[in-house]
Amino acid sequence: MTEYKLVVVGDGGVGKSALTIQLIQNHFVEEYDPTIEDSYRKQVVIDGETCLLDILDTAGQEEYSAMRDQYMRTGEGFLLVFAVNEAKSFENVANYREQIRRVKDSDDVPMVLVGNKCDLSSRSVDFRTVSETAKGYGIPNVDTSAKTRMGVDEAFYTLVREIRKHRERHDNNKPQKKKKCQIM
């Protein structure tokens, strides 16, 4: 079974834990309880392949920013989560993206831009801006609502597909070992 190490990043209060718990337990967490760091595992079937998702739900609070480099090193793919009703959380996505690219020392890191809280009527980040930003980054974007479960599976599954593409690109770039044969 293939394992995928997914990391959920974003500002505090954007719904990272709510999205993760909705995926894992099919349950919406109403109250806000700031996360320091939680890890979840779930077996799912994506495109006919059984996968084990190892999901790290991270702290959004600034006081835990020192921990970020460590989990960014170990993660294979990242959900960049912001709240559609909070423009500042969208602006801060660029900082998370840059930090991931710096820590990974690569421009080619699987990521998905996730606009959460789409069930709320007070959207301050319009869909076109999100779409254009994602296109500029060269990554997919998914609108979600942890409350209604809209787009939750799609966000995580899209990230797994991005990791698969990344693995294929990098496996194809590895030089093939030549077998040596001696005839005596």
From Swiss-Prot:
Q: Which InterPro entries match?
A: P-loop_NTPase, Small_GTP-bd, Small_GTPase, Small_GTPase_Ras-type
Q: What is its EC number?
A: 3.6.5.2
Q: Name one GO molecular function term.
A: phospholipase binding
Presence of the UniProt keyword Heme in the record: no
> Could you confirm whether the keyword Cell membrane appears in this record?
yes
Q: Where is this motif: Effector region?
A: 32-40
Assembly and partners are described as: Interacts with soc-2. Interacts (in GTP-bound form) with plc-1 (via Ras-associating domain 1).
Protein name, entry field? Ras protein let-60
Organism of derivation: Caenorhabditis elegans
